[in-house]
Amino acid sequence: MSIKTILWPTDLSRYSREAIDDVVSLSNKYDAKVVVLYSTVDLCSYFPAYGNYPNPERLNDFRDWEVERARKALNKLCDEELRNCPLIEIRLAHGDPVKNILEHAELEQADLIVLSSHGLGREKKNTPADVIGSVTDRIIKQSPVSVHVVKNK
């Protein structure tokens, strides 16, 4: 088995971070590059249900704020937690996380996707531990490459 590129999608939740040890271990075992992917929220997808769109400038301002916040958090995470990986690259995408993960798996020519069994949804909704998260479930079913799932504690 040859693994040159590992894609680690994260929503920066505490559950998502539980995959860090496996990401570091696998990247060192295979001397693989780690691509860290964060997907920003597409706020426009929420507004049709409410009837009115907010001012586009405000949406852009919020998106810019979220991207900057995510970039800072990802840089800190990589500096503190992934510093022992051979090579790290950060990617930010906008929109549906599943779509972004699948697209980046192909774009980055990932050999492996590493995910935690749950992410932000479990933090917000208190999803039972025995139910796999919706993003992870969809990636397992649709991924063109192998998926390594880290069971959350």
Describe each model-derived feature in a short phrase.
Residues 1-56:
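Small/aliphatic-rich secondary-structure junction motif
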Residues 69, 92-96, 153:
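Short beta->alpha linker loops
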Residues 35-37, 89-93, 148:
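General small-molecule cofactor/ligand-binding pocket signal
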Residues 104-153:
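Gly/Ser-rich helix-loop-strand patches that form or flank binding pockets
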Residues 43-44, 100, 122:
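Generic structural signal for helix capping and beta-alpha/helix-loop junctions
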Residues 1, 15, 79-113:
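Structural beta-alpha unit
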Residues 55-72:
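A short acidic, glycine-rich active-site loop
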